[in-house]
Amino acid sequence: QVEAAAAGSRAVRFLPFRPAEQVPYVLAAGDLHVVTVKPGLEGVVVPSKLYGILAAGRPVLAIAPEESDVVRIVRRTGCGVAADPREPEAVAEAVRSLARDPERLAHMGRRAREIAHEYDRVSQLEKFVQVVEEAGRR
């Protein structure tokens, strides 16, 4: 259904599955990456593709509830924009706005790359170890 809805669009492409070693190249090729969180799942999930997108230095369009971690990350770091999934016109306007402002899009991509290290496996493991050690001291 999603592919049918975008049929004929020159702005949207659906790519076949790629082997893991090709993923960084695929992520780096996109002008803007969409990360979605279904309403009701905020606070429960953060799609793992977000971290690859940040590492690739690409901007994010977070289509997610305001309370989601994805929206918090995007807003706090300036690596993209957010729109509520229950407001399709807001999503469309976010895309239109970014399409008209390639400099802003490029800035968001740079911010994504700058903050990617905060979310890599090593940083996350260090944070986890710190939390566990602090809990053990209590």
Predicted features by range, described:
Residues A90, S97, R104-E118:
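A short, well-ordered alpha-helix in the C-terminal region of glycosyltransferases
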